[in-house]
């Protein structure tokens, strides 16, 4: 009982932190420490919760006097626990990076409030056990993201925020419609109970289930930045400061991916493979369009932004395989991408602070004056491309292996070729930015960049440690994958085998 009650700490601590930030007022330095302390304390409880899950299996917390499926349920399995931990680590790094990057004006007002508010929504999305509360937590982190996008009030920010809000409001409307249709069919909102009841539906109801699936895919693909709903991502994510872009790129797209994986495994396993072919088709197109974008620009931010799309597609290929190997790859790669994307955005933020430009054609020769920055970026680039033994390799290895096991050889080849495109896109930044001809930047001995560079190095080191720990993590990732390719593990933990 005590162990299950600890799940709620993952939401309560960030919420208490939010309240504290409101009452602190216009004192940015205190806000920094409060936000960091709240995140660190939540991380400690997240590790405690993970340890409990590893010992006892998925843990369920039922709020109120009702049993599942009638109560509000929170469920923590290994994958959701790992996602929560990685989200908290990334958030701590982002808070530290923000000290020297977002500006005192943003820090004075609602910046840290919005960061913690968004973190609460992200964590809630990972641990909620019913579909309506998934919608609620989506709206929580979306409202926070609106605040983060407009803080600072530049013209570009406001313009891109309008587009971002319109896309997400439309997506949210379709989410409500999908939930309403699903409830009309099964009469429940509990994820595990929906899974049980959908599996018992007569075959004549398969048409309505397919329509519901299409609606959910539209909604979650929008959140994940997958094809065809990726068009908002490069513009909306380009506008705010680097710390906010790192936050969005590392966390928000992963919530959409998680929602696709969870609902596909629980709800749509019996739709004559239509759901998984659809996910695979969208995944491959996402990879292709992401690759085109990554090699089409000289802007360092846009190159990494399009690499977000490539990663989303690669992960969804693993999800579409819906076997143990594919899900292991998807989980490995999701955790890896959360860490390395944050690290790469941090690093290009340092490069911008030095050169005052994101245009590769306007700077070069940085390796002479900033060798630590250069070689740190090189390691991060290799990790992103999936070069062994760095963290990006293991996820892609399992995903490609899964495609070959299932006979989807072309899909595996697309994933492999995407690695070459990713490597080319980031090595181009490395070669031009650090070894190209210097184009006008001046070394400023008084430039305050060492703080954000230190955070960037820490992020890369954590990613490297994650890759080098792959053998130790393998049994944990294998168990995490089981709740997806064998959803009865999840449903039995919630419904007690009923």
UniProtKB/Swiss-Prot annotation:
Keywords on record: Antiport, Cell membrane, Hydrogen ion transport, Ion transport, Membrane, Sodium, Sodium transport, Transmembrane, Transmembrane helix, Transport
GO molecular function: antiporter activity; NADH dehydrogenase (ubiquinone) activity
A Pfam family the protein falls into: Proton_antipo_M
GO CC entries: plasma membrane
Subcellular location: Cell membrane
GO biological process: one example: sodium ion transport
InterPro entries assigned: CPA3_Na-H_Antiporter_D, NADH_UbQ_OxRdtase, ND/Mrp_TM
Membrane topology field: Multi-pass membrane protein
Transmembrane segments: 5-25, 34-54, 75-95, 109-129, 131-151, 174-194, 207-227, 231-251, 275-295, 303-323, 331-351, 373-393, 407-427, 452-472
Subunit structure as annotated in this protein's UniProt entry: May form a heterooligomeric complex that consists of seven subunits: mnhA1, mnhB1, mnhC1, mnhD1, mnhE1, mnhF1 and mnhG1.
Its job: Mnh complex is a Na(+)/H(+) antiporter involved in Na(+) excretion.
Protein family (similarity comment): Belongs to the CPA3 antiporters (TC 2.A.63) subunit D family.
Protein name: Na(+)/H(+) antiporter subunit D1
Organism: Staphylococcus saprophyticus subsp. saprophyticus (strain ATCC 15305 / DSM 20229 / NCIMB 8711 / NCTC 7292 / S-41)
Taxonomic lineage of the native organism: Bacteria, Bacillati, Bacillota, Bacilli, Bacillales
């Amino acid at each position: 009982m005590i162990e299950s009650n600890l799940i709620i700490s993952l939401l309560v601590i960030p919420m208490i932190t939010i309240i504290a930030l409101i009452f602190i007022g216009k004192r940015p330095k205190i806000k920094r420490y409060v936000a960091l302390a709240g995140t660190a304390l939540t991380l400690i409880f997240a590790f405690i919760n993970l340890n409990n899950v590893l010992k006892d299996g998925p843990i369920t917390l039922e709020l109120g006097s009702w049993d599942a499926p009638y109560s509000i349920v929170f469920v923590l399995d290994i994958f959701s626990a790992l996602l929560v931990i990685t989200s908290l680590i990334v958030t701590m790094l982002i808070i530290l990076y923000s000290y020297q990057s977002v500006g005192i004006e943003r820090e004075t007002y609602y910046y840290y409030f919005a960061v913690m508010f968004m973190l609460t929504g992200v964590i809630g999305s990972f641990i909620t056990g019913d579909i309506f509360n998934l919608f609620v937590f989506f709206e929580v982190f979306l409202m926070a993201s609106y605040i983060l996008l407009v803080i600072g009030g530049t013209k570009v920010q406001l313009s891109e925020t309008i587009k971002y809000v319109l896309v997400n409001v439309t997506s949210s409307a379709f989410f409500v419609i999908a939930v309403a249709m699903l409830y009309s069919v099964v009469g429940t909102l509990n994820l595990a109970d929906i899974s049980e009841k959908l599996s018992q539906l007569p075959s004549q109801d398969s048409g309505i289930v397919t329509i519901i699936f299409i609606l959910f895919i539209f909604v979650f693909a929008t959140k994940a930045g997958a094809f065809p709903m990726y068009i908002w991502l490069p513009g909306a994510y380009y506008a705010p400061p680097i710390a906010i872009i790192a936050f969005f790129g590392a966390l928000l797209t992963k919530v959409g991916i998680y929602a696709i994986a969870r609902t596909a495994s629980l709800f749509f396993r019996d739709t004559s493979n239509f759901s998984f072919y659809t996910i695979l088709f969208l995944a491959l197109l996402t990879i292709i369009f992401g690759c085109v974008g990554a090699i089409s620009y000289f802007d360092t931010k846009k190159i990494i932004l399009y690499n977000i799309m490539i990663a989303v597609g690669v992960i969804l290929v693993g999800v579409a395989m819906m076997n143990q190997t594919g899900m292991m790859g998807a989980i490995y790669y999701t955790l890896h991408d959360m860490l390395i994307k944050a690290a790469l955005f941090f690093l290009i933020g340092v490069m911008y602070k030095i050169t005052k430009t994101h245009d590769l054609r306007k700077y070069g020769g940085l390796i002479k004056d900033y060798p630590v920055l250069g070689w740190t970026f090189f390691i991060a680039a290799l990790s992103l491309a999936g070069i062994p033994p760095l963290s990006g390799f293991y996820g892609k290895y399992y995903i490609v292996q899964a495609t070959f096991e299932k006979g989807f050889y072309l899909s595996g080849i697309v994933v492999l070729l995407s690695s070459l495109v990713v490597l080319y896109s980031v090595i181009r930044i490395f070669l031009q930015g650090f070894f190209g001809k210097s184009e006008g930047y001046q070394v400023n001995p008084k430039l305050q960049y060492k703080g954000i560079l230190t955070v960037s190095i820490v992020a890369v080191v954590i990613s490297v440690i994650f890759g080098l720990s792959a053998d130790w993590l393998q049994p944990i990732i294998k168990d995490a994958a089981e709740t997806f390719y064998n959803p009865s593990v999840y449903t039995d933990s919630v419904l007690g085998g009923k």
